[in-house]
Amino acid sequence: VLLDCGNFPVSPFCNALNDLGLTPKDVKGILISHGHGDHINQHTLKISEAFDIPLHIHQKTYNVVSKRLNVSHSSKLVKHHNERAFRVNNIKVRAFETFHEGGYVGKPFGFVLEGVGERKFKIGYLTDTSAVSEEMVECLVDSEVLVIESNNDVKMVEDNDPRDSNWLQHLNNVEAADAVVKIKNASRGKNALKYVFAAHISSRHNTPKRVLAMFNEKFKKANINDIEIIITDQEEPTPVITI
């Protein structure tokens, strides 16, 4: 399952899968969080149609994407989801609403993925939100792996673009770290939050060093010492983990 697919033309997409020992046939679905172009664009639709990969997208998001791209995607490949759980092969997917505005956003969501059958796991995905609600925390409790945006450092924003309000649509380092602490403290599973991927890190308004410093500061105050923080990069592949 792919979570968003906005920056890969077909050939680099295939190459990236090949580096992982996979092919497009191994991808059984693409989940779309919202309608902004870095999450879904023409490349996404071409990949979906070229390899018959279903596109799981909310109706409101599909409507704005269709308008923005001026296209009509193959109806047999479009699966409209809501907040009810659905299956993609042996993975149960639950979508939950997030807070994100601006442009062709549609209706934004985060996701929880859980293994069905013998292989049990829980993965949480939360990016592109201006806040983290108690309902979101509840959804993400006991995730073994969490992908969460840590988009900006407030001081860097104030120094670089004090009049730019776009960053308010994303979690800053403090908000992201606080959310992780809340999720960890509410979890009961022994493997809860073994890995946290800090994602959607702004190249202009943030640095990996600032992300790590804030997460470690918050974890120390909360007496949390068993979470591995993995910094993601917009240009370089993220290390692969096994759960």
Predicted feature residues:
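Pre-active-site segment of Zn-dependent metallo-hydrolases
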Residues: V1-I32, N41-Q42, V132-M136, A176
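Conserved beta-strand hairpin/beta-sheet module of binuclear metal-dependent hydrolase folds
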Residues: V1-L20, K107-D128, V145
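Active-site neighborhood of phospho(di)ester-bond hydrolases with catalytic His/Asp-centered motifs
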Residues: L2-G6, V27-H36, H56-Q59, G124-T127, ...
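Short beta->alpha connector loops
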Residues: N7-P9, H36-D38, F99-Y104, D128-V132
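Active-site HxH/HxHxD metal-binding segment of metal-dependent hydrolases
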Residues: N18-R84
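Metallo-beta-lactamase
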Residues: H58-K120
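Short, charged/polar "capping" segments at the starts of alpha-helices
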Residues: T61-K67, H205, T238-V240
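Cap/insert and terminal regions of metallo-dependent hydrolase folds
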Residues: E134-T232
